[in-house]
Amino acid sequence: MIEFVFMLTHHDRTVDRPADVYRGIRDCGLRYVGFKDIGASVADLREVCDQAHADGLEVMLEVVSTSKADELRSIAAAAEIGVDWVLGGTHPRDGIAVLAGSKARYCPFPGTVVDHPSVLLGEIAEIAESAREITALDGVYGLDLLAYRHPTADVAALTSAVVRASAGPVIAAGSVASLEQVATLDAAGAWGFTIGSAIFEGRLPGGPAIDAQIRQVLAAAGQA
């Protein structure tokens, strides 16, 4: 089984009126829901977080800001909102300091991450070594791996190498758009994966209905 995180996001931005979207899928059987630090106000994100917590879900915020200052502001906002997980970011030591005293599980990006939407660069061995170094830090729980955002790497080989190197769970995020990709990530040992854009575009079985697609993905992930 692999964990599915439904992201209330499209093109690396939180969708408009995310709380309204969440209310439409709250009965699908999800365990995890997430959003990005770009595209919605802190108040909107807090509303989603509070509703999801009331429904028994864990909440993830993924940081995709491209500047260090914006990244750290987003991590601070995540702590203020009260999310359970903070994903992404490229300055783990600074992120650890910002999250000091928070209960959020911190999972930064391994490797070299550039641009928005985010792209992962580097050789597999380099990314795996980055994974080892980052998860050795006190205050890092796991990793947010942009497995399908690497322009050339074999996704299965990349994910397997990072999973082996990591001292914590690996969540594969970005551009997951098919059940075949989910199976690849599961076989490679990823703890979980995120899907947002592909569902909002109706590209999964059950589409275009968002709730039907979520149920299909949950079944493929072994959570139905």
Put a short name on every predicted segment.
Residues K68-E80, G122-E129, A157, A161-I195:
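Catalytic cores of alpha/beta
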Residues I25, G189, A221-A224:
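Alpha-helix boundary/capping residues
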Residues G56, V64, K68-P151:
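Conserved anion-binding
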Residues V42-S65, R93-S118, T152-Q181, D211-A224:
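Alpha-helix-loop-beta-strand connector modules within alpha/beta enzyme cores
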Residues I81-G95, D138-H150, S175-V176, Q181, ...:
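Glycine-rich phosphate-binding active-site loops on the catalytic face of alpha/beta enzymes
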Residues I2-T9, V33-F35, V59-V63, W85-G88, ...:
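Hydrophobic faces of well-ordered beta-strands that scaffold small-molecule active sites
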Residues R13, R17, A40, D70, ...:
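Alpha-helix N-cap and loop-to-helix initiation/capping positions
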Residues M1-V59, T66-A69, I75-G82, R132-D138, ...:
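Conserved N-terminal beta1-alpha1 strand-loop-helix module at the mouth
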